[in-house]
Amino acid sequence: MNPSKFKNALGEVKKEKFLNCNVTTVSTEGRYIAVNGNFLAMSWSNMGEIVVVDSSSFCSVKPDQPRIKGHRANVLDLEFSPFSSDLLAAAFDDCSVLLYKIPEGGLTEHLTQEVQLYQKHMKKVPFVTFNPVASDVLCTGAFLGDIHVWNALKGETYVELKADDTPTSVQWSPSGSLIGATTKKKNINIFDPRANKMIMNQIINEQFQAAKFGWLDNEQFVTTSWTKNKEKKIRLWDIRKVKDDLSSEGEVTSIKIDSSTTVTTPFVDKESKLIYAIAKGESMIRTYDYSSGTFIKGIDFSGAEPSISTVMFERKCLDYNRLEVDRFARFVNSQKVYYISYTIPRRNQGFDPTLYPPVECGEAALTYDQWVEGQNAEPIKKEINTIENKFVSKVEVFVKQEAKVEVKTPEMKIKELEGKIAEMSVKINQLEEENAKLKKKKKKKKAQKTEEEHVEIQQDEQKQEIEIQNEEEQPQEEQPQEEEQPQKIEIQKEEEQPQEEQPQEEEQPQEEEPQEDNQE
């Protein structure tokens, strides 16, 4: 596989977040949160309580949020079953491990009853992990090196193993046949649980900080540990090359991370061979590509807040249409949980099968009894476009059912092409007919529009003619009225004035005459 396809994987924080996550901060080497395609589980600040929400429905967690409660002890580790997304295992500091069954659709009320209780450890239990191949096989690691393998259905111990010191990380090999545990004694112990023996005890660390590890395949694993020069490195080991216990044999290659003392966990994508170095208390994620057989430094991701707990999604939960190659859920100081998505930057996004080898589909290859009897198997994997799972991208190409492969002869291919050509010609004829109809409609509308415009123009012309006629007729009617009026007034004045003055002149002499006679 070409390393250039993955070395440029770019991490980006998704905008959506879970808020008001009052997650506990009890000191532990385990995980405060667990995630799968259905649920996100968080160990709550109240002793023994676990909040479970829909992993795809981002929300602000309410104070009265339904939760798992009833067991009065601090949660030290959480993990969902790879075969039953509703089965949650929780390890506690009172030496007990409980299994809870989440109802379909999530919690609608407080869950107080577990489906299984395991109390065979004598010390705190910071690690719980499911077998990746066989159903109902659980491994738990406790203080002072007690490692138990037990039946999850019955709560019965199958075997008790003893590490050389308190474990700092515990993991099954990809085939579920071996168990690895790094310890505070600077070593890694490899166990064959069905043979009830330690098959390897290797020195991997030369400083006092806790080392962590992760399986690359069934024979190789990577560690994050320190050298004598206090350099923190990612180192690749091969168990086939180790001949003696407590030796430094088996190291294949390494690459320096930095010189800090923060405990760093390697998260390994076994399909793409990408390795993510994530330190508790740091915001950065360093990426390394080992697909070519040597470590190639990738692009670092730098977040805004330091990580308290980070977990990795299963590959079947990724969005293949966005070319997403990995995704993490991270809990930070500000009581938030957000997702970090790693994608391959491309101009044209879309499903690229070369980026996605077959992935584990969530089906158990063995039962508990088959595994105990000594049967071996690899995880069941399927091509991405054959997985029927609601967490996989909803694009049809990714969720179509598995089809039988049909070998086609040249004649069959020719017939198939001829059929496609015939279908295309029919479609072309249909489109041409539709186009002709549209053109007719367009012409008809245009003709109607021109007629309407012509009528409007005629109406406007008629209006203008009427207005002009009115303007011409109006002055002829008004002019004679203006001329006649002053004539009438003058005639009236002439007639009225003489009639009023004449009698006055005649009356005056008549009044004076008698006065003269009297005087005489």
Task: Spell out what each predicted region is.
Residues 87-92, 99, 121, 137-139, ...:
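Generic alpha-helical hydrophobic packing signal
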Residues 118-309, 314-317:
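WD40 beta-propeller repeat blades
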Residues 240-243, 253, 400, 406, ...:
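N-terminal non-cleavable signal-anchor helices
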Residues 48-49, 168, 204-209, 213-217, ...:
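A general secondary-structure boundary signal
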